[in-house]
Amino acid sequence: MLSVIILAAGKGTRMHSSLPKTLHTICGEPMLFYILETAFSISDDVHLVLHHQQERIKEAVLERSKGVIFHTQIVEKYSGTGGAIMQEDKTPIPTKHERVLILNADMPLITKDALAPLLESQNNAIGLLHLADPKGYGRVVLENHQVKKIVEEKDANDEEKTIQSVNAGVYGFERKFLEKYLPKLHDQNAQKEYYLTDLIALGINENEKIDALFLEEECFLGVNSQTERAKAEEIMLERLRKNAMDLGVVMQLPSSIYLEKGVSFKGECVLEQGVRLIGNCLIENAHIKAYSVIEESQIVNSSVGPFAHARPKSVICNSHVGNFVETKNAKLQGAKAGHLSYLGDCEIGKNTNVGAGVITCNYDGKKKHQTIIGENVFIGSDSQLVAPINIGSNVLIGSGTTITKDIPSGSLSLSRAPQINIENGYFKFFKKP
C-alpha cells in the first residue's frame, strides 16, 4: 500500500473567481472530488494540503468524505510545491505507509489506470509527459530511463529546448527519501519557493536513482484557467458519453448531449440531440427527446419531450410528458401531459390526461402547496388547479376551469362564466367598413 498526498493550497488566480479553484465543477462534480475518488481507490491514507480558503474546501469535502486527513501549508514560511509537504521543522507530513504518491488537486482527469506506472514502480519516480509542443514547460533530461536533470525553459540551451519530455507534476517517493532530502530543500530561486523538482535535483546530486515514467497526456491536464476547465470538461463528457453508449444507450448526435457524473442508465434508453441530464438522474427504459432538460429526476418507462423540462424531484413513471411541459417535484404514474403545462408539487395517478395549458398553481407568494390528482382523470385544456387541492379519481374537468376546491371522485367540474354574444358589439369599438 501507499499513502497519497494531494496538493490543493494554491489561490487559482487565473480562474478569476471567488470560488476556490478545486471546487469548480467538471460535469457537475467539483474537480477536487474526482482526484479524491481516484486517491481512495488506491489508498487508505489520503492527505489533503490546503491554505487558500481552506475552511470552505474542508467543509465541502467533509460533506462527502470523512476519511481525508487535512493539513495546512505554512505558506508564509514554506511556499511552493515542496513547501506543501513540509511541517514546521521541514520534515515531511506524517503518512501511514512507506511509499508516498503526490498528486495535484487540479487534475480531475487522472484515473487509477493512468497512474499504473507510478503504482507499479518501487523506486523514487517522477511522472513525465511527451509533448509535441513543450513550449512553456521545464524539460526533463533523461539518461537510461533515469532523470539526469530538470531544466526550466528559460535556463535551457538550444539542444535542451528540443527535448519533448516534461514534468507531469506527479511523483512517487519513498518516505525515507523525503525524510533525507526535504530538510535540505531551500528557496534560493527567483520565486523564493520550495520546489519538488529541486528535491529531485538534490537526490540526483547524491546519485539517487529517479525513474522517469511516461504517462498519458490527456489524463494529466492541469486546470488553471476557465479555458482549461472547459477543455477538461469536454474530455470528461466524452468519457461519460462513451460509458453510457457502452451500456447500450442510443445517442443521436452525441457531441450535442450534456450529462453529468451522477447520471445512471438502466435498460434501453434513447437520448436525442441537445438533451441535458443534470445532477443525480435515473434514466431507465426511457426516450428523452430533443432539447429536453432533466435535473435530479427519475424517468422510468416513459418518454419526455421534445423541449420538456423535468426539474428536481420529478419522478415520471410509465408516462408521457410532451413538448414544452415543465415538472417540478412531480410524481406521474401512468399519466399523460402532452403539451404546454406546468406541473409542480403534484401527484398524478394512472390513466390521467392533462390537457394543453394546464397549470398547477402551487405558490401563494409565501409557501408551496401540493396538488393530488387521482386515477382516470381528464383535465381539459387551459385549466388552473389552485393548490392545495385534492382531485379524486374518475373526474372530468371542463376546459378553461379554475379549480379552487377539492373534487370528489366521479364528478364533473366546471367553473366557466356563461358565454355572451352581443349583436353588433364589434362596431361599438370600430367603425363599420
Swiss-Prot record:
<feature type="binding site">
    <location>
        <position position="167"/>
    </location>
    <ligand>
        <name>UDP-N-acetyl-alpha-D-glucosamine</name>
    </ligand>
</feature>
<dbReference type="GO" id="GO:0000287">
    <property type="term" value="F:magnesium ion binding"/>
</dbReference>
<keyword id="KW-0133">Cell shape</keyword>
<feature type="binding site">
    <location>
        <position position="353"/>
    </location>
    <ligand>
        <name>UDP-N-acetyl-alpha-D-glucosamine</name>
    </ligand>
</feature>
<feature type="binding site">
    <location>
        <begin position="362"/>
        <end position="363"/>
    </location>
    <ligand>
        <name>acetyl-CoA</name>
    </ligand>
</feature>
<keyword id="KW-0479">Metal-binding</keyword>
<keyword id="KW-0961">Cell wall biogenesis/degradation</keyword>
<dbReference type="InterPro" id="IPR001451">
    <property type="entry name" value="Hexapep"/>
</dbReference>
<feature type="binding site">
    <location>
        <position position="138"/>
    </location>
    <ligand>
        <name>UDP-N-acetyl-alpha-D-glucosamine</name>
    </ligand>
</feature>
<feature type="region of interest" description="Pyrophosphorylase">
    <location>
        <begin position="1"/>
        <end position="226"/>
    </location>
</feature>
<dbReference type="GO" id="GO:0071555">
    <property type="term" value="P:cell wall organization"/>
</dbReference>
<dbReference type="GO" id="GO:0005737">
    <property type="term" value="C:cytoplasm"/>
</dbReference>
<dbReference type="GO" id="GO:0000902">
    <property type="term" value="P:cell morphogenesis"/>
</dbReference>
<dbReference type="InterPro" id="IPR025877">
    <property type="entry name" value="MobA-like_NTP_Trfase"/>
</dbReference>
<keyword id="KW-0963">Cytoplasm</keyword>
<feature type="binding site">
    <location>
        <begin position="7"/>
        <end position="10"/>
    </location>
    <ligand>
        <name>UDP-N-acetyl-alpha-D-glucosamine</name>
    </ligand>
</feature>
<feature type="binding site">
    <location>
        <position position="106"/>
    </location>
    <ligand>
        <name>Mg(2+)</name>
    </ligand>
</feature>
<feature type="binding site">
    <location>
        <position position="381"/>
    </location>
    <ligand>
        <name>acetyl-CoA</name>
    </ligand>
</feature>
<keyword id="KW-0677">Repeat</keyword>
<feature type="binding site">
    <location>
        <position position="416"/>
    </location>
    <ligand>
        <name>acetyl-CoA</name>
    </ligand>
</feature>
<keyword id="KW-0012">Acyltransferase</keyword>
<feature type="binding site">
    <location>
        <position position="152"/>
    </location>
    <ligand>
        <name>UDP-N-acetyl-alpha-D-glucosamine</name>
    </ligand>
</feature>
<dbReference type="InterPro" id="IPR018357">
    <property type="entry name" value="Hexapep_transf_CS"/>
</dbReference>
<dbReference type="InterPro" id="IPR050065">
    <property type="entry name" value="GlmU-like"/>
</dbReference>
<dbReference type="GO" id="GO:0009245">
    <property type="term" value="P:lipid A biosynthetic process"/>
</dbReference>
<feature type="active site" description="Proton acceptor">
    <location>
        <position position="339"/>
    </location>
</feature>
<feature type="region of interest" description="Linker">
    <location>
        <begin position="227"/>
        <end position="247"/>
    </location>
</feature>
<dbReference type="GO" id="GO:0006048">
    <property type="term" value="P:UDP-N-acetylglucosamine biosynthetic process"/>
</dbReference>
<dbReference type="GO" id="GO:0019134">
    <property type="term" value="F:glucosamine-1-phosphate N-acetyltransferase activity"/>
</dbReference>
<dbReference type="InterPro" id="IPR005882">
    <property type="entry name" value="Bifunctional_GlmU"/>
</dbReference>
<dbReference type="GO" id="GO:0008360">
    <property type="term" value="P:regulation of cell shape"/>
</dbReference>
<keyword id="KW-0460">Magnesium</keyword>
<dbReference type="Pfam" id="PF00132">
    <property type="entry name" value="Hexapep"/>
</dbReference>
<keyword id="KW-0548">Nucleotidyltransferase</keyword>
<comment type="function">
    <text>Catalyzes the last two sequential reactions in the de novo biosynthetic pathway for UDP-N-acetylglucosamine (UDP-GlcNAc). The C-terminal domain catalyzes the transfer of acetyl group from acetyl coenzyme A to glucosamine-1-phosphate (GlcN-1-P) to produce N-acetylglucosamine-1-phosphate (GlcNAc-1-P), which is converted into UDP-GlcNAc by the transfer of uridine 5-monophosphate (from uridine 5-triphosphate), a reaction catalyzed by the N-terminal domain.</text>
</comment>
<dbReference type="InterPro" id="IPR011004">
    <property type="entry name" value="Trimer_LpxA-like_sf"/>
</dbReference>
<comment type="pathway">
    <text>Nucleotide-sugar biosynthesis; UDP-N-acetyl-alpha-D-glucosamine biosynthesis; UDP-N-acetyl-alpha-D-glucosamine from N-acetyl-alpha-D-glucosamine 1-phosphate: step 1/1.</text>
</comment>
<comment type="pathway">
    <text>Nucleotide-sugar biosynthesis; UDP-N-acetyl-alpha-D-glucosamine biosynthesis; N-acetyl-alpha-D-glucosamine 1-phosphate from alpha-D-glucosamine 6-phosphate (route II): step 2/2.</text>
</comment>
<dbReference type="InterPro" id="IPR029044">
    <property type="entry name" value="Nucleotide-diphossugar_trans"/>
</dbReference>
<feature type="binding site">
    <location>
        <position position="399"/>
    </location>
    <ligand>
        <name>acetyl-CoA</name>
    </ligand>
</feature>
<feature type="binding site">
    <location>
        <position position="21"/>
    </location>
    <ligand>
        <name>UDP-N-acetyl-alpha-D-glucosamine</name>
    </ligand>
</feature>
<dbReference type="Pfam" id="PF12804">
    <property type="entry name" value="NTP_transf_3"/>
</dbReference>
